[in-house]
């Protein structure tokens, strides 16, 4: 019953497809009397939170980073910070968490539970560079230019000398992984979702 939120369709300009997908989702969610939605993807988080209400789909929307922060604060998750304490980790801000929803401190708070060696990229937070996948760009051919965005962003990572990139978006994960492969750095630098780092820190 679960289907795409319609975010890629709307970003690509196919409003009819977006509304069809959105209304189908709202019908299913309302049939289960859903009040709260926990999202993994920032694109889904943004569209459920900020755009579905215009179509009658009003829910409490929580991103999993917020959920993890609360679980850590309440002592529900016990993290062994020795596993990554000396590992140099940088964080890539997903556009739909950062720019669209001003969620900058929450992922960094999670990371501070994992490592003492966190390093910011020069372009971070409000100045962070997109990974290149947003706005449905992931589903189309690259436009003409001197360099693709995912390569530019990977070069930002390399300047930090980090051995782990952390992010919180499946689109960003794909683009950063591709960037590491393009630069032949996939053996030296690993790409993790924040939830994966937490899981490994808990020896799960």
Residue ranges of model-derived segments:
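Iron-sulfur cluster-binding electron-transfer modules in prokaryotic oxidoreductases
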Residues: 1-204
């Amino acid at each position: 019953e679960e289907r795409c939120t319609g975010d890629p369709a709307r970003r690509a300009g196919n409003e009819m497809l977006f509304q069809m997908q959105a209304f189908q989702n709202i019908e299913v969610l309302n049939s289960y009397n859903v009040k709260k939605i926990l999202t993994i993807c920032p694109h889904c988080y943004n569209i459920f939170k900020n755009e579905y209400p215009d179509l009658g789909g009003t829910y409490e929307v929580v991103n999993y980073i917020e959920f993890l922060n609360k679980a850590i604060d309440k002592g529900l998750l016990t993290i062994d910070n020795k596993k990554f304490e000396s590992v140099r980790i940088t964080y890539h801000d997903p556009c739909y968490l950062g720019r669209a929803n001003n969620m900058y401190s929450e992922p960094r708070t999670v990371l501070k539970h994992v490592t003492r060696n966190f390093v910011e990229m020069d372009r971070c937070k409000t100045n962070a560079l997109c990974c290149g996948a947003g706005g449905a760009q992931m589903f189309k051919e690259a436009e003409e230019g001197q360099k693709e965005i995912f390569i530019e962003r990977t070069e930002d990572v390399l300047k930090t000398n980090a051995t782990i990139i952390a992010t919180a978006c499946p689109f960003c994960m794909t683009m950063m992984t591709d960037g590491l492969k393009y630069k032949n750095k996939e053996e030296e630098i690993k790409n993790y979702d924040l939830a994966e780092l937490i899981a490994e820190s808990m020896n799960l």
